[in-house]
Every structure is written in C-alpha cells, then in structure tokens.
Amino acid sequence: MLQDSASPHSNDEKRAALADAAWALLAAHDIDKIGLDTVADMAGIEHGLAGALGGSVQRLVLAKMATLDSQSVMESFDDIKDAGEVSIREKIIEGLLHRFETYAPYRAQIDQLNRSARRHPELALRLLDGLEAVVRRVLVMAGDSAHGLKGMLRVKGVVAVFLATARVWMKDESPDLAATMKMLDQRMVKAEEWGFSLRLFDGKHGDHADQNHHDDSSASRYGVDND
C-alpha cells in the first residue's frame, strides 16, 4: 500500500493516491493488465469508491500526467520569470526541456504508454491532446499568444518537435540531458525555418534574437504573431 503512514482523507487526496498507485504499477505492467481493484488495494482505497473516483486505470494515469505537466510548467515559469531578457525561443526550449527532466524518472511508464498507444487509438489521442495542452501553456507562458489558426499551427509544430526529440530522450542517460538538449535545439531551428516559410510568424521578431550558438543569419528565428 502506498498510504501506510497516513491514509488520505478527502476525495481529492484519495483520487491523487489512486493516480499515484496506477502510475507506479504502470512502470512494470501493461496498462491493459492493471486492474482498478489492484490500484485501489495499493492505494488503500475501498474498491467501490475507487471506481467512483477514478473510473478507469487509464483516467487515473492521465490524471497523474496532468499533475506532472502542471508541476513542470509552473517550475519553468518560476525559472523564466526571473531570467531577465530571454528570447521567446529560449523560454520555449526551457519549458520543453524541463518537461523531459520532470519525466526522466518515469521512462518506464512512458515506454509502456507508447506501446499501449499503438494498440489503442483512443489512448494515443488522449496522450496527444494532453501534450498539445501543455505545449500551448509553454508557448503562452513564453510570450507567444498561440492565438488563431497560425497559433494552432505553431502549437502543433512544437508538438512535432517534442515528439521527435522524445526518441532521443528515451535513450539519453546523461545527467544534464545533453543529447536531448542538442536534438531539441536542432529541431526547433528546423521548425522555425518551416514556420517562416509558411508565414506563421510576423516580421517583428527583432526582440527575440537568438543566442550565441547560432550565426547572425539564424538569429531571432522565433517571432510572435499576435493575430
């Protein structure tokens, strides 16, 4: 049982305990083979109440991911708000990289979800929807309104960057995620080039100058379209 020292009291605490238990079990089990009663037993919650609070193991797993995503975004916000003059591009990279850092202890769970998503399209859609939601939060936090059709396309572009980088992240055992950072930076450059070719940014991006590791021609690639 997860709750051996202090049992949860409120329904919110019990739901969180169920989500934690489902997430822990996911590290070693296919999501299809995890029973809600098993999750309830691990969390120390009565079976009927677990059904009322959680509904399904999948819902509990997604709830745990939503909690981790909120934690990641708010920690990135705390880092960024005191960072001074930082480009939108670097803020976005910081937000994405921190999500990878947040999930680094949970690669086993992500691997299980990736396998399950190939068999269950509805799970794949839910995971993608959750990723789009957190990417939108990162963009808005960084100063990109992500508004309108162009904003939606920018969100989807950054989602594609994240998914491509995730393949490297799954194998990146370095403490500073150096390989992940390198791939993320490279993919962002390519995404920005596509964004400009498709006119997804306005021309006013001089305030978002790129950093020293890019040449002058590639500086300030990430503009903001306030449409």
Pin down the residues of each PLM region:
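N-terminal intrinsically disordered/low-complexity leader segments
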Residues: 1-13, 201-227
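Helix-turn-helix
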Residues: 2, 17, 25-67
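Short, leucine-enriched amphipathic alpha-helices that occur as contiguous helical runs
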Residues: 11, 15-23
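Hydrophobic alpha-helical connector segments
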Residues: 59, 63, 77-112, 119, ...
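Short, basic, alpha-helical segments at the C-terminal edge of helix-turn-helix-like DNA-binding modules
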Residues: 65-73, 121
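Acidic/His metal-coordination segments adjacent to aromatic residues that form catalytic metal sites
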Residues: 81, 85, 140-147
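Amphipathic alpha-helical packing segments from all-alpha helical-bundle domains
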Residues: 121-144, 152-164
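Hydrophobic/aromatic-rich alpha-helical bundle segments in the mid-to-C-terminal region
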Residues: 144-206
